[in-house]
């Protein structure tokens, strides 16, 4: 029972002016929105990750060294 699904062929979609008008606006908008999301620092606030200058406190400016991994906490 072969047949068609009634959908438009992909080649018709790609050659359509309407497709390119819509996507020439939405695709760059997504990149700009993503860039603003990261560059403004909103991504740090939304996901709760520390900003680059907040990884270590003022008293500790380097990564901690684990000396007793299996010891009691």
Swiss-Prot record:
Its cofactor is heme b. It is found in: Plastid, Chloroplast thylakoid membrane. GO terms for biological process: photosynthetic electron transport chain. Heterodimer of an alpha subunit and a beta subunit. PSII is composed of 1 copy each of membrane proteins PsbA, PsbB, PsbC, PsbD, PsbE, PsbF, PsbH, PsbI, PsbJ, PsbK, PsbL, PsbM, PsbT, PsbY, PsbZ, Psb30/Ycf12, at least 3 peripheral proteins of the oxygen-evolving complex and a large number of cofactors. It forms dimeric complexes. This b-type cytochrome is tightly associated with the reaction center of photosystem II (PSII). PSII is a light-driven water:plastoquinone oxidoreductase that uses light energy to abstract electrons from H(2)O, generating O(2) and a proton gradient subsequently used for ATP formation. It consists of a core antenna complex that captures photons, and an electron transfer chain that converts photonic excitation into a charge separation. With its partner (PsbF) binds heme. PSII binds additional chlorophylls, carotenoids and specific lipids. It comes from Bigelowiella natans. Heme binds at residue 23. It comes from the Eukaryota. One of its GO terms (molecular function) is electron transfer activity. Its main location: plastid. It is a single-pass membrane protein. This is Cytochrome b559 subunit alpha. Belongs to the PsbE/PsbF family. Coiled coil: none annotated. InterPro entries: PSII_cyt_b559_asu, PSII_cyt_b559_asu_sf, PSII_cyt_b559_CS, PSII_cyt_b559_N, PSII_cytb559_asu_lum. The keyword Transmembrane helix applies. The chain crosses the membrane at residues 21-35. One of its GO terms (cellular component) is chloroplast thylakoid membrane. Pfam families: Cytochrom_B559, Cytochrom_B559a. Keywords: Chloroplast, Electron transport, Heme, Iron, Membrane, Metal-binding, Photosynthesis, Photosystem II, Plastid, Thylakoid, Transmembrane, Transmembrane helix, Transport.
């Amino acid at each position: 029972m072969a047949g068609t699904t009634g959908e438009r062929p992909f080649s018709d979609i790609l050659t359509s002016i309407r497709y390119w008008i819509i996507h020439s606006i939405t695709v760059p908008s997504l990149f700009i929105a993503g860039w603003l999301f990261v560059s403004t620092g909103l991504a740090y606030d939304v996901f709760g990750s520390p900003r680059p200058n907040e990884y270590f406190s003022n008293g500790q400016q380097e990564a901690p060294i684990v000396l007793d991994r299996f010891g009691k906490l």
